[in-house]
């Protein structure tokens, strides 16, 4: 018997083992049946890595002391929102932000010892990961021409130094607002009258922490009209508005002074606030004079509204007849939804919301480093949905470029230009290569 024949069984076993391993890895990364297996493995990795970050890397003192100083003034009885301030300046966040950090102030053993707060933010970080995983999973339900969002998209969510820093080392309010917002997206995806009402409640609570949630509002208006009709849209907006009025009630009713109402809203929702040029991440390549100019602000607002209008008109109603048909049906039957849910894929809701936010990021007057959390968890979803121009290599290149810009501190002319180019490429990609209206053949396959 030859040596080759003796070794052939072992060789066959080795090839079989390699083939089995490759199949297992492929299933863990792409097979919907193994979505939560992979998500859980990544979750465990995030737990270990995050604990290591908290243990090994010092907390960064930026806004936490100012938050606590603002809380001190609130607890001391100050109810004029315009007078509440800390070492970094006046309080510019809505009331729920103040209440959350008041809870930290009350419940933590010491506001000087931030380690317990870091573990709370670790909880926020892990909850955000689970929430976004749920959004990806629900978006991948194979119905109405939709398709699976593979769990390989979750891997980039674990690779950002900036994201870990924002959540675990700096204790900003941005992650809290985004976690509540992601919970609202899940409620919208679950759907039904109760789901949309709960989603609007959660959306408003997120807005009550930070006004960046307004970036998602144009997309939400479109979705409310599509899924809930005119009456449902009015109901949803009423829920959001009522909560925004109830949250600051302690400031309104402490004294019979109408000025306090105006002081709250002009402080918590100050659209005219000037940003410091030294902290900008996305506009370093222009002069400070141009950065602070009113003309630039007006131009950016006009561009923002124009692109939102284009997406609303041509991209956000992926049904036969498009936006005109949706509008016609909505206004002719205001009590019912303006489109058939069976006509749109499961990813429609997060895609509209996330793309509206990305447009806001593109035209933002300034982005600071903590604003990275406003869209970081959405990027793999958007790139897979067309922002990567339908090409894996392009998607990876855009993601790496954007992350490099955020990881470089302080920002430079080149990193700001790269970030703006990355945002522009993603918005154009979504518009020209975004997921198209499912064809009749796709729908029949989905059934």
UniProtKB/Swiss-Prot annotation:
Primary subcellular site in the record, as a coarse category: endoplasmic reticulum
TM stretches of this protein: 35-55, 84-104, 119-139, 171-191, 205-225, 233-253, 297-317, 344-364, 380-400, 412-432
Lumenal compartment spans: 1-34, 105-118, 192-204, 254-296, 365-379, 433-447
Pfam families: ALG3
MF annotations from Gene Ontology: dol-P-Man:Man(5)GlcNAc(2)-PP-Dol alpha-1,3-mannosyltransferase activity
Localization per Swiss-Prot or TrEMBL: Endoplasmic reticulum membrane
InterPro entries from the UniProt entry: Glycosyltransferase_ALG3
Keyword Transferase: yes
Catalysed reactions, semicolon-separated: an alpha-D-Man-(1->2)-alpha-D-Man-(1->2)-alpha-D-Man-(1->3)-[alpha-D-Man-(1->6)]-beta-D-Man-(1->4)-beta-D-GlcNAc-(1->4)-alpha-D-GlcNAc-diphospho-di-trans,poly-cis-dolichol + a di-trans,poly-cis-dolichyl beta-D-mannosyl phosphate = an alpha-D-Man-(1->2)-alpha-D-Man-(1->2)-alpha-D-Man-(1->3)-[alpha-D-Man-(1->3)-alpha-D-Man-(1->6)]-beta-D-Man-(1->4)-beta-D-GlcNAc-(1->4)-alpha-D-GlcNAc-diphospho-di-trans,poly-cis-dolichol + a di-trans,poly-cis-dolichyl phosphate + H(+)
Top-level taxon in the UniProt lineage: Eukaryota
GO cellular component: endoplasmic reticulum membrane
Listed pathway(s): Protein modification; protein glycosylation
Membrane topology: Multi-pass membrane protein
KW Transferase (keyword) present: yes
UniProt keywords, alphabetically: Endoplasmic reticulum, Glycosyltransferase, Membrane, Transferase, Transmembrane, Transmembrane helix
The protein's Enzyme Commission number: 2.4.1.258
Broad class of enzyme this protein falls into: transferase
Family: Belongs to the glycosyltransferase ALG3 family.
Role played: Dol-P-Man:Man(5)GlcNAc(2)-PP-Dol alpha-1,3-mannosyltransferase that operates in the biosynthetic pathway of dolichol-linked oligosaccharides, the glycan precursors employed in protein asparagine (N)-glycosylation. The assembly of dolichol-linked oligosaccharides begins on the cytosolic side of the endoplasmic reticulum membrane and finishes in its lumen. The sequential addition of sugars to dolichol pyrophosphate produces dolichol-linked oligosaccharides containing fourteen sugars, including two GlcNAcs, nine mannoses and three glucoses.
PANTHER family according to UniProt: DOL-P-MAN:MAN(5)GLCNAC(2)-PP-DOL ALPHA-1,3-MANNOSYLTRANSFERASE (PTHR12646:SF0), NOT56 - RELATED (PTHR12646)
Protein's recorded name: Dol-P-Man:Man(5)GlcNAc(2)-PP-Dol alpha-1,3-mannosyltransferase
Gene source species: Cryptococcus neoformans var. neoformans serotype D (strain B-3501A)
Lineage: Eukaryota, Fungi, Dikarya, Basidiomycota, Agaricomycotina
């Amino acid at each position: 018997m030859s040596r080759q024949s003796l070794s052939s069984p072992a060789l066959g076993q080795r090839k079989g083992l390699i083939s089995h391993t490759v199949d297992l890895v492929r299933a863990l990364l792409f097979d919907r049946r193994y979505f939560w297996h992979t998500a859980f493995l990544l979750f465990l990795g995030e737990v270990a890595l995050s604990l290591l970050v908290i243990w090994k890397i010092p907390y960064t003192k930026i806004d936490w002391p100012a938050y606590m100083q603002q809380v001190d003034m609130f607890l001391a009885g100050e109810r004029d929102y315009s007078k509440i301030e800390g070492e970094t300046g006046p309080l510019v966040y809505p009331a729920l932000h103040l209440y959350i950090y008041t809870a930290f102030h009350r419940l933590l053993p010491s506001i000087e010892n931030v380690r317990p707060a870091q573990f709370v933010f670790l909880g926020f970080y892990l909850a955000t990961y689970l929430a976004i995983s749920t959004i990806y999973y629900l978006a991948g339900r194979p119905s109405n021409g939709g398709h699976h969002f593979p769990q390989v998209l979750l891997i980039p969510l674990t690779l950002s130094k900036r994201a870990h820093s924002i959540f675990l080392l700096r204790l900003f309010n941005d992650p809290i607002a985004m976690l509540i917002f992601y919970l609202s997206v899940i409620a919208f995806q679950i759907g039904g009258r109760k789901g949309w009402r709960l989603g609007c409640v959660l959306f408003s609570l997120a807005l009550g922490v930070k006004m960046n949630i307004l970036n998602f509002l144009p997309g939400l208006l479109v979705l409310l009209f599509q899924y809930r009709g005119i009456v449902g849209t009015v109901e949803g907006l009423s829920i959001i508005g009522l909560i925004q009025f109830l949250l600051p009630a302690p400031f309104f009713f402490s004294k019979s002074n109408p000025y306090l109402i105006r002081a709250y809203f002009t402080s918590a929702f100050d659209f005219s606030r000037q940003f410091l040029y030294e902290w900008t991440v996305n506009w370093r390549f222009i002069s400070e004079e141009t950065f602070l100019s009113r003309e630039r602000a007006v131009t950016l607002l006009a561009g923002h509204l124009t692109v939102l209008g284009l997406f609303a008109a041509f991209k956000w109603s992926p049904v036969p007849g498009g936006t005109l048909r949706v509008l016609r049906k909505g206004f002719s039957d205001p009590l019912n939804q303006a489109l058939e849910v069976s006509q749109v894929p499961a990813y429609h809701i997060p895609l509209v919301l996330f793309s509206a936010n990305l447009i806001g990021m593109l035209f933002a007057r300034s982005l600071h480093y903590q604003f990275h959390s406003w869209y970081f968890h959405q990027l793999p979803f958007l790139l897979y949905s067309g922002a990567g121009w339908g090409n894996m290599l392009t998607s990876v290149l855009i993601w790496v470029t954007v992350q490099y810009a955020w990881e470089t501190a302080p920002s430079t002319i080149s990193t700001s230009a790269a970030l703006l180019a990355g945002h522009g490429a993603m918005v154009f990609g979504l518009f020209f290569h975004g997921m198209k209206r499912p064809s009749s053949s796709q729908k029949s396959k989905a059934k």
